[in-house]
């Protein structure tokens, strides 16, 4: 892994996404500028934290960060653009939503969206960069809450448990009940459930 050198600027934003793999719902992104004067203990990749810990950290991040913002791309945008381009768009929206313009942006992963300031992609950034860890927590808590809300409307699919990912249970219910308007029609299993696959 390439050694990560932290940029020598004051206002660094971290950006991460949640929800590229699910068959349903938006891809959700977050951008966070942390306050060096108000450190947050225990930041890590959201997937390595318990749900309870994520919820506590989410509130602390919102309270202590200099600026934070959420972005998203809806299922119809994912279907129109493809998941990669929709994710880049959602990241651009998260950065644009910051009320303080960052001097530098660190993106989790291996590619950066076009931004009006310098940026760098950091592989496994959600475990290596506190700003990206914070962004991953905000994005995951937000998307998980959306899946729990969708589960109330469509209880037969089990969205609260699998968060829209293509588990055996989700695929079984998709075949049984068909797709909701929140499913991504360009994704193979959804296409097949709708009889659109060639």
Curated annotation (Swiss-Prot):
Residue ranges annotated for the RNase H type-2 domain, each copy included: 10-198
Keyword flag Ribonucleoprotein: no
Reactions the enzyme catalyzes: Endonucleolytic cleavage to 5'-phosphomonoester
CDD domains: RNase_HII_bacteria_HII_like
GO cellular component, one term: ribonuclease H2 complex
Cofactor(s) required for function per UniProt: Mn(2+); Mg(2+)
Family, similarity comment: Belongs to the RNase HII family.
Name of the protein described by the UniProt record: Ribonuclease HII
């Amino acid at each position: 892994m390439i050694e990560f050198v932290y940029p020598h600027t004051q206002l660094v934003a971290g950006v991460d996404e949640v929800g590229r793999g699910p068959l349903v719902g938006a891809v959700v992104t977050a951008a966070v500028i942390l306050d060096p004067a108000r450190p947050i203990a225990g930041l890590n990749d959201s997937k390595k934290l318990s749900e309870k810990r994520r919820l506590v950290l989410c509130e602390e991040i919102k309270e202590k960060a200099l600026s934070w913002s959420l972005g998203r791309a809806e299922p119809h945008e994912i279907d129109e653009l493809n998941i990669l381009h929709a994710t880049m768009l959602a990241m651009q929206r998260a950065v644009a939503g910051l009320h303080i313009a960052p001097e530098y942006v660190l993106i989790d992963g291996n590619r950066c969206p076009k931004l009006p300031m310098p940026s760098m992609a950091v592989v496994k950034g959600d475990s290596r960069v506190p700003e990206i860890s914070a962004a991953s927590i905000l994005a995951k808590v937000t998307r998980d809450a959306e899946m729990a809300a969708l589960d109330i409307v469509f209880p037969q699919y089990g969205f609260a448990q699998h968060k829209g990912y293509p588990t055996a249970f989700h695929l079984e219910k998709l075949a049984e009940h068909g797709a909701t308007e929140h499913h991504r029609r360009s994704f193979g299993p959804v296409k097949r459930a709708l009889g659109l696959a060639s």
